[in-house]
Amino acid sequence: MTLEAIDVHHGYGDETVFDGVSLSVSPGEVVAIIGPSGVGKSTLLRLFALFDSPDRGSITYEGSDVWSVSENHRLDIRRQIGMVFQDASLFDASVKRNAEYGLRVRKPWSERIRHELASIVGRTNGTGPAVEALETVGLDDKLEQDATSLSGGEAQRVAFARALAYEPDVLLLDEPTSDLDPRNTAVLEEAILEARERGIGVAVATHDMHQAERIADRVAVLLGNEILEVGETETVFEAPRDERTRKFIDGELIY
């Protein structure tokens, strides 16, 4: 269930964003994609989420090129990939209904029925996949609260729970804590680590290198249209192979 970018070239018009980028996200690991703002971290996540197709190279899932398979197969793959954007978008409904949304639209019919039944039972006994996901982010005490009344940090936690509830194979997070206070940041980081323990592969795009050190098993350094290096987090931070990586980590490179 590995999601992988292989020698990906991508751009918009005359602007080159990636010139031969390769990166994998495997089950049960957290990969942090670090780099300054505007370098293409979000674009890489969009490619992983199958929102965009690369100009050259391939995105593969379980070894199959996702843009070479049938549309129905690609839709099945999309259902295995969850994404949480930087700015959470919630509906005018309860916290629980927002967390259930992914179960209703992302799963095949057979799975939707199973999760809907679990959700109905959960309304009487306080369980179910959405409730369990909300417990993970510490919001199971706000199930019936209007989601639009939540703080920004709480809304981001609901968005994470919504993606987690339908049990994706891969979870993509785009600067998930960039505007959050320390408490909400800590809750989400703990939830990310719990997702890893469940066997979910997690890719986090972040400019916060301290966060990458706290939660990531591996780090990919994205600078200047390419990934300079990928490696175990401690190794990249303590003994980077590329001099540009060292300068970026030390704050000597300004983009």
Where are the predicted features?
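Helix-to-loop junction immediately C-terminal to a conserved catalytic motif
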Residues: 49
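Catalytic Walker B motif of ABC-type/P-loop ATPase nucleotide-binding domains
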Residues: 171-174
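A short, proline-enriched helix->beta-strand linker immediately N-terminal to the Walker B motif
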Residues: 165-169
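Conserved ABC ATPase "signature" region
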Residues: 107, 112-142
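Conserved ABC transporter NBD signature motif
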Residues: 57-68, 77
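A short, surface-exposed alpha-helical micro-motif characterized by mixed small hydrophobic
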Residues: 212-214
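ABC ATPase C-loop
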Residues: 158, 163-164
